[in-house]
């Protein structure tokens, strides 16, 4: 399992839970992280709590109808706004499962917080006492990437830039809802070939301009923070972006030129002596060494494999102390 780095960008006054679960079953959504805003709280049994729980129940019901939904519950000052967004390439059943899990966990982890967001690999759920519909938001965000470098970094950077420019144009100019585009391409170069899988997605409440800005900022972060890794993904409240490369496949060896033909042997004059046949080639094992019983051993040099070890780096953007 490749070692990975996780980078969080969140305002300083947030607290968060995150996990990268290596032993989850296939039926469980993959939890990435949860961010709660502790500066805006409500009391138990308050109207806000009732509205929050009603909102989350409404999102659960809507998850069977599509990959995106938003909702508003209650009257001011206890109004709660919420949304969910499922990844565009998962099934409706997976979306329902993720949203049901996320709405339960976000209420459990952020018990009395008026604002919170929870990210899974398959979906995102959030709620807030402030309306965020159609608003461009970049934080809180999380970036996950591998420490395995991409093949031929200089050319890979050019390939990746061209590919995401194409995807961002396609997703922002598409009428599909939600904005979602994925692509797979076989990239061939002198060192060999590899498969490049790419994906971009925006929240459908964004207009074309803000969708483009969100994805370009996400790509800038992922391409400058991580040293061109072979795998990376970034989650923000309004868009997500990811890429992955397969193992580099070596090019087939060039056909070698056939060796020059040997000149025909010179005929020797007949000899009057009788010809003695050459003795057959016989391999004789060294004496006093027992014959092996068919087993053998050899040394294998393995790469450094670190299982379940995660390095976490937190960066606080001075200019990004915005509300969730």
UniProtKB/Swiss-Prot annotation:
Record's keyword annotation contains Secreted: yes
Q: Where are the transmembrane segments?
A: none
Q: Sorted alphabetically, which PROSITE patterns does this protein's record hold?
A: GNK2
Outline the segment boundaries, as ranges, of region: Disordered.
251-286
In its keyword annotation, does this UniProt entry include Zinc-finger? no
CDD domains xref list? Gnk2-like
Keyword terms: Repeat, Secreted, Signal
What the entry lists under Gene3D superfamilies is as follows: Gnk2 domain, C-X8-C-X2-C motif (3.30.430.20)
Which InterPro entries does this chain map to? GNK2, GNK2_sf
Q: Which parts of the sequence belong to the Gnk2-homologous domain?
A: 29-132, 138-248
Q: Which GO terms describe its cellular component?
A: extracellular region
Give the Pfam families listed for this entry.
Answer: Stress-antifung
Using the record, list the residue span of the signal peptide; answer none if the entry has no such feature: 1-27
| Compartments reported by the entry | Secreted
- State the family it belongs to: Belongs to the cysteine-rich repeat secretory protein family.
- Name of this chain's protein: Cysteine-rich repeat secretory protein 9
The species is: Arabidopsis thaliana
Q: Which gene encodes it?
A: CRRSP9
């Amino acid at each position: 399992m490749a070692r990975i780095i996780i980078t969080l960008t969140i305002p300083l006054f947030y607290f968060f839970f995150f996990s990268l679960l290596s032993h989850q079953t296939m039926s469980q959504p993959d939890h990435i992280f949860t961010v709660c805003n502790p500066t805006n709280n409500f009391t138990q049994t308050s109207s806000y709590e009732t509205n929050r729980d009603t909102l989350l129940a409404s999102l659960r019901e809507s998850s069977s109808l599509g990959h995106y939904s938003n909702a508003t519950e209650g009257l001011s000052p206890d109004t709660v706004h919420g949304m969910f967004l499922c990844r565009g390439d998962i099934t409706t059943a997976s979306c329902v499962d993720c949203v049901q899990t996320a709405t339960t966990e976000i209420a459990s982890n952020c018990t009395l917080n008026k604002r919170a967001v929870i990210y899974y690999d398959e979906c995102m759920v959030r709620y807030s006492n402030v309306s965020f519909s159609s608003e461009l938001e970049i934080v809180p965000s999380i970036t996950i990437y591998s420490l395995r470098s991409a093949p031929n970094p200089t050319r890979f950077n050019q390939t990746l830039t061209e590919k995401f420019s194409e995807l961002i144009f396609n997703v922002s100019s598409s009428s599909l809802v939600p904005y979602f585009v994925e692509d797979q391409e076989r990239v061939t170069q002198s060192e060999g070939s590899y498969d490049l899988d790419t994906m971009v997605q925006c929240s459908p409440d964004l207009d074309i301009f803000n969708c483009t800005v969100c994805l370009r900022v996400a790509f800038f972060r992922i391409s400058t923070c991580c040293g061109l890794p072979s795998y990376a993904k970034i989650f923000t409240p309004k868009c997500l972006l990811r890429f992955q490369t397969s193992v580099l496949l070596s090019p087939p060896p060039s056909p070698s030129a056939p060796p020059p033909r040997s000149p025909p042997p010179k005929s020797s004059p007949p000899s009057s002596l009788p010809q003695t046949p050459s003795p057959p080639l016989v391999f004789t094992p060294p004496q006093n060494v027992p014959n092996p019983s068919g087993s053998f051993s050899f040394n294998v040099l393995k790469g450094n494999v670190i299982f379940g070890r995660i390095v976490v780096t937190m960066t606080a953007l001075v200019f990004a102390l915005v509300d969730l």
